């Protein structure tokens, strides 16, 4: 005779069959219902519990599906052997100390971070209309797409890059992926090593390369970009550069330095490569942009071109793309032929139409006007708040950030604390020193204005002046 301790509560909100299933499973795990025990018939148990036969049947079927019960023809249900979880040692493991409470997060009054963009500039209505039209007209969006990227998007990108960035490629050379870091991580195993990166530079690129086992050396940046002289002295076989807008200094690599870089790669054909991250190339305010390094090298040159839509559209639109030299395509396809695409076809086809129907270039023109006005307002506010000679601005002509180098600066740690206290979110040039050995970077603010509100530009200069004064006072009293 099986004695069950099951108690069901019709008012609990949990279905009765679910309650019965949980109760019986618990008794089987605890050993109260031993292996081999024959369970009561469904009608009998239903009568004992005052529930319907369907309720008992549903619970039994769930228990059988999960291996607690075995159904034997014309015999009923029997409890299966259950391997209990190993018991914990007496006293259990030593409990970790309770986490310390997090310090309160102060509200951000001025967002001067370098990765921000202005969501108010996003073309919501156009983007939504294109997506709606695609939903009604493109049932293939629900099927598997090309792992290298949707053909329509790759065609649109090839035409756009040729016209506006001088990139020489066909659609078959373009790979679309969910973010620059993702593509860089796939590219790294295809190239020789070691690799050279810029310092100050992009910490994420360095981390991705190192995570893929690439030995990296950090080479200095001067007023023309990465030092090719230092590159020649290194043993690097790959060079990662941001020539259109060196991040975070804002330096643009001139044509002469670009030619030197290409000559460096050409001295060892097939053994040296340049990874060109065309970061913020869309945002050049005062002069025409130089053509890409890839365009100078040609479709089968030593340059791999990388770019992303995270700045021109929105960070949440995870569409980045890479242009591979012709001779690397067979290597790529062999290594990644079984990989799936990482960007939805829906977003890819939306972007393809956004480009081919002319919306993208108009959107960029609108952004350039808005960001240029914001840059001018920020620079004017800084020049008004600080006395002549107290502050030197640099990196104004490209990208969405500028540098503000302080004369006789307080320690960077004091600047960080003072900025946080005033609700200012910013970076310091030393944050991007990838060697930790560049004292000249101290006292230089990296001020992004992509997320800065237009109405905040007038007062941000005085607030930063206040931050510097507070940092100096704090460093004197320490």
PLM regions: where:
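Short glycine-rich anion-binding loops that position phosphate/pyrophosphate groups of nucleotides
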Residues: 117, 244-246, 311, 452
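Residue-level marker for buried hydrophobic side chains located in beta-strands
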Residues: 112, 274-275
């Amino acid at each position: 005779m099986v004695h069950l301790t099951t108690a069901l509560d019709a008012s609990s909100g949990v279905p009765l069959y679910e309650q019965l299933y949980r109760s019986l499973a618990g008794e089987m795990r605890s050993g109260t219902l031993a292996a081999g025990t024959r369970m009561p018939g469904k009608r009998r148990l239903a009568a004992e519990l005052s529930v319907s036969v369907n309720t008992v049947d549903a619970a039994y079927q769930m228990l059988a599906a999960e291996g607690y019960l075995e159904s034997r023809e014309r015999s009923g249900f029997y409890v299966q052997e259950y391997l209990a979880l190993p018991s914990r040692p007496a006293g259990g493991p030593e409990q970790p100390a309770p986490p310390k409470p997090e310090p309160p997060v102060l509200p951000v009054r001025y967002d001067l971070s370098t990765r921000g963009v202005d969501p108010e500039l996003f073309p919501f209505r156009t983007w939504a209309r294109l997506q709606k039209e695609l939903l009604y007209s493109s049932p293939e969006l629900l099927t598997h797409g090309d792992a290298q990227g949707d053909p329509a998007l790759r065609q649109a990108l090839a035409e756009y890059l040729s016209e506006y960035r001088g990139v020489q490629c066909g659609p078959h050379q373009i790979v679309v992926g969910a973010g620059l870091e993702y593509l860089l991580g796939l590219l790294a195993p295809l190239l020789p090593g070691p690799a050279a990166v810029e310092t100050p530079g992009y910490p994420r690129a360095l981390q991705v390369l190192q995570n893929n086992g690439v030995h990296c050396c950090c080479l200095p940046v001067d007023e023309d970009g990465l030092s090719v002289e230092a590159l020649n002295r290194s043993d690097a076989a790959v060079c990662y550069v941001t020539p259109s807008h060196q991040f975070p200094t804002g330096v643009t690599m001139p044509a002469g330095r670009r030619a030197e870089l290409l000559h460096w790669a050409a001295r060892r054909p097939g053994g040296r490569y340049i990874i060109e991250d065309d970061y913020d190339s869309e945002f050049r305010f005062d002069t025409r942009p130089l053509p890409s390094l890839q365009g100078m090298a040609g479709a089968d040159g030593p340059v791999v071109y990388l770019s992303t839509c995270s700045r021109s559209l929105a960070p949440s639109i995870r569409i980045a793309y890479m242009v591979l030299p012709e001779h690397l395509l067979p290597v790529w396809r062999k290594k990644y032929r079984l990989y799936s695409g990482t960007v939805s076809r829906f977003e890819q086809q939306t972007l393809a139409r956004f480009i081919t129907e002319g919306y993208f270039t108009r959107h960029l023109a609108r952004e350039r006007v808005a960001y240029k006005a914001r840059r001018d307002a920020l620079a004017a506010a800084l020049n008004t708040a600080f006395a002549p000679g107290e502050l030197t601005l640099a990196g104004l002509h490209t990208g969405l950030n500028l540098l503000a180098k302080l004369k006789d600066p307080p320690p960077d740690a004091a600047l960080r604390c003072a900025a946080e206290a005033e609700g200012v979110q910013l970076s310091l040039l030393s944050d991007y020193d990838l060697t930790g050995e560049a004292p000249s970077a101290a006292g230089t603010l990296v001020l992004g204005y992509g997320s800065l509100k237009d109405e905040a530009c007038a007062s941000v200069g005085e607030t930063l002046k206040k931050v510097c004064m507070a940092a100096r006072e704090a460093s004197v009293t320490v």
